[in-house]
Amino acid sequence: MDPLPRRASLQNTGNVGEGWVRQYLCQQGWQILAQRWRCPWGELDLVAHKADVLIFVEVKTRSPGSWDRGGLLAVGIPKQRRLIRAAQAFLSQHPHLSELSCRFDVALIERRASREGVSYALVDYLPAAFEIC
């Protein structure tokens, strides 16, 4: 099997999952400031603002029964460090946001395939999933 189509398919799956979380956050009153923001230390899936809080959201889209508990185990200490560094880079480019309280959230999206097609659902949203140590 050619890895390029699979990679494109996985990337599209991730994009759809991020879209679901983006919609969820907007419904909760959050203003999306960035999606798939990249820097040398990594990527921030979503950055959003509401009141005096800035959130950096890591989105994991998985099929049921995935090895990493729906994506949760994929956000281990090394990934958290990369997200923190990326958030610091984001704040250095947007200093007007640096006075806000910052939070790291994780959103878990489930992708189900059936004969009728593919469906997505927000399984869990974990505010303050990890803290800066």
UniProtKB/Swiss-Prot annotation:
Coiled coil: none
Pfam families (alphabetical): UPF0102
InterPro entries linked: Restrct_endonuc-II-like, tRNA_endonuc-like_dom_sf, UPF0102_YraN-like
Gene Ontology terms for molecular function: nucleic acid binding
Protein name: UPF0102 protein CYB_2119
Native species: Synechococcus sp. (strain JA-2-3B'a(2-13)) (Cyanobacteria bacterium Yellowstone B-Prime)
SUPFAM superfamilies in UniProt: Restriction endonuclease-like
Family designation: Belongs to the UPF0102 family.
